[in-house]
């Protein structure tokens, strides 16, 4: 049974778009891109305190199915590598005990990694993950507006961070952690977000109240790149 120390509950954590000095940065490798039927095959994480890595987590996972060639071509994880690995229900409990109630950080996790974690927490423990999280893809758009690409490798190149070993979870974590710390320095030149501002669930930028043909509505400040709207 999952430890009572692990932060599970009925309400998912919030998306933050700000720097935090203490966090767990994580990355997943999977058999594909769909959380409807794909499975995790590797999960890695770095525990960070005041911007410094203090602990690591790195586990391969046996998905109990063949890994598609297309996935192996990207992450270089093969069936032979995971044959003796534990199943994900075991690894997930270890991972949850590692992260505790820390803020989670990762690249594009709002649209990808968090969905897998929510799914499997609910699948194995009948509760969901309550940790707040920062998506460095959205944070980069806030700190470095106007760039054409915000892929992790592109951001790493901006700061001269080596990209060797990309697409293995632990290597991506180390790259992403450095990017996040550099973005935090960029953030000092970006106006502080009012805590009462509502963030766009699509891109993480603040929503602004606008007027249209049918009255007032909330629209993303990232328009026209992001066209998210909602009723007032």
Which residues does each predicted region cover?
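Conserved non-catalytic scaffold segment of RNase H-like nuclease domains
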Residues: 2-118, 122-123, 127, 145-167
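Residues immediately within or flanking Cys/His clusters that coordinate Zn2+
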Residues: 153, 197, 217, 223
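Short cysteine-rich clusters marking metal-coordination/redox-active sites
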Residues: 200-203, 220
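Acidic, divalent-metal-coordinating active-site segment for phosphoryl/phosphodiester hydrolysis
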Residues: 168-181
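Short linker/helix segments within small regulatory modules
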Residues: 211-219
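Short alpha-helix plus adjacent loop in nuclease-associated cores
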Residues: 133-150
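Short metal-binding segments enriched for Cys and/or His
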Residues: 224-232
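Mixed-charge, glycine-rich, non-catalytic linkers/tails in nucleic-acid processing enzymes
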Residues: 182-198
């Amino acid at each position: 049974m999952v430890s009572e120390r692990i932060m599970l509950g009925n309400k998912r954590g919030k998306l933050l778009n700000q720097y935090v000095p203490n966090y767990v940065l994580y990355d997943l490798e999977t058999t594909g891109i769909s959380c409807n039927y794909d499975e995790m095959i590797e999960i890695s994480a770095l525990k960070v305190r005041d911007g410094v890595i203090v602990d690591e987590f790195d586990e391969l996972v046996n998905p109990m199915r063949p890994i598609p060639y297309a996935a192996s071509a990207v992450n270089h994880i093969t069936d032979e590598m995971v044959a003796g690995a534990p199943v994900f229900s075991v690894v997930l409990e270890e991972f949850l005990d590692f992260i505790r109630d820390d803020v989670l950080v990762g690249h594009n996790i709002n649209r990808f990694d968090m969905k897998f974690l929510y799914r499997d927490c609910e699948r194995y423990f009948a509760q969901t993950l309550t940790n707040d999280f920062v998506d460095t893809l959205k944070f980069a758009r806030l700190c470095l507006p106007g760039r054409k690409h915000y892929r992790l490798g592109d951001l790493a190149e901006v700061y001269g961070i080596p990209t060797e070993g990309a697409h293995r979870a632990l290597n991506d974590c180390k790259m992403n952690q450095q990017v996040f710390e550099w973005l935090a320095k960029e953030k000092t030149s970006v106006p502080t977000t009012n805590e009462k501002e509502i963030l766009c669930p699509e891109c993480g930028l603040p929503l602004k109240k606008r007027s249209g043909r049918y009255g007032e509505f909330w629209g993303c400040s990232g328009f026209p790149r992001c066209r998210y709207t909602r009723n007032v």
